[in-house]
UniProtKB/Swiss-Prot annotation:
SUPFAM superfamilies: alpha/beta-Hydrolases. This is 2-hydroxy-6-oxononadienedioate/2-hydroxy-6-oxononatrienedioate hydrolase. One of its GO terms (molecular function) is 2-hydroxy-6-oxonona-2,4-dienedioate hydrolase activity. Belongs to the AB hydrolase superfamily. MhpC family. The record marks 194 as: Catalytic role in ketonization of the dienol substrate (substrate destabilization). Its EC number is 3.7.1.14. Homodimer. Residues 39-275 form the AB hydrolase-1 domain. It holds the Pfam family Abhydrolase_1. GO terms for biological process: 3-phenylpropionate catabolic process; acylglycerol catabolic process. InterPro entries: AB_hydrolase_1 (IPR000073), AB_hydrolase_fold (IPR029058), AB_hydrolase_sf (IPR050266), Epox_hydrolase-like (IPR000639), MhpC_alpha/beta_hydrolase (IPR023791). Keywords: Aromatic hydrocarbons catabolism, Hydrolase. The keyword Flavoprotein does not apply.
Length: 289
């Protein structure tokens, strides 16, 4: 593997590609950094204003430095990718998008890191394309089914859906205050960037609400099929996750053929950001061994 960590910014890595979806074509945005022989794809969560870069900007450079090519996909309906109303499985839609992207880039096999919705989508991709998956890292998602201890939808999910319906700075603050364990770590610049990204694409916000109306269960439960996944999997969770409770992660570990789990203390739903240094070391070691 080779390492190239110079000039890794959102702008310098920003790219677009057109892929087939259904009877037509859609445009995907992605960030592409590094030149390694192995590729790591990172899939973001479903919050308003989310993007590959916003979710994983603290994690790109360590992976590139370790010798990987790193691709951050903006899923359809988020950031600079095309809008979409999803009346079926969002997980499977994102899995198809990832396959289309990899086919377009002529990449056969990847490791996938998925946060929340991205974890669900990684599982969907692994089930549909097992031969194209090296290792999986799943944080705060992965379709392990509903929590056995916390009423669904959770506090965090209710706030997320409320923010989609009323995209205001006050509602953003309410959601972010339970998104992470220590909300004091959220800078004004971070909050403003999230707000700007959210309001820049009101079509995405409106389409998410339309999608929920068309199909309230956007992320189907793959729990009964988890045993089909043979890829080595690292499940990472925040002990204090108020969006997707920790017991959901335990069900992933119990269901998959070859999974292990790490639980971060004093951590909410954003492990790769809240504990970035430890997370990066752990993931680089897991992928290498």
């Amino acid at each position: 593997m080779t390492s190239n960590v110079s000039a890794i910014t959102e702008a310098s890595t920003s790219k677009f590609v057109r892929i087939k979806e259904g009877d037509g074509e859609v445009q995907l945005h992605y960030n592409d950094a590094g030149q390694g022989a192995e590729t790591v794809v990172m899939l973001h969560g479903s919050g308003p204003g989310a993007s590959g870069w916003a979710n994983f900007n603290r994690n790109v450079e360590p992976l590139v430095a370790a010798g990987y090519r790193v691709i951050l996909l903006d899923c359809l309906g988020w950031s600079k990718s095309d809008p979409v109303v999803c009346d079926g499985s969002r997980s499977e839609l994102n899995a198809r998008s990832l396959k289309g992207l990899l086919d377009a880039l002529d990449i056969e096999r990847v490791h996938i890191i998925g946060n929340s919705m991205g974890g669900h989508s990684a599982v969907a991709f692994a089930l549909a394309n097992p031969q194209r998956v090296g290792k999986l890292v799943l944080m705060g998602g992965g379709t392990g089914g509903p929590s056995q201890f916390v009423p669904m939808p959770t506090e965090g999910i209710k706030l997320l859906q409320g923010l989609y319906r009323e995209p205001t700075i006050d509602n953003l603050k309410r959601m972010m205050n339970v998104f992470v364990f220590d909300a004091s770590a959220l800078t004004d610049d971070l909050m403003q960037a999230r707000l700007d990204n959210m309001l820049a694409r009101r079509d995405h916000l409106e389409n998410f609400v339309k999608s929920l109306a068309a199909n309230p269960k956007q992320f189907n439960d793959f729990g009964p099929r988890l045993g089909e996944i043979a890829a080595p999997t690292l499940v990472i969770w925040g002990r204090d996750d108020r969006f997707v409770p920790m017991d959901v992660g335990l069900r992933l570990v119990a269901g998959m053929q070859n999974a292990e789990m790490h639980i971060f203390s004093r951590c909410g739903h954003w492990a790769q950001w809240e504990h970035a240094e430890k997370f990066n070391r752990m993931v680089v070691d897991f992928l290498a061994h």
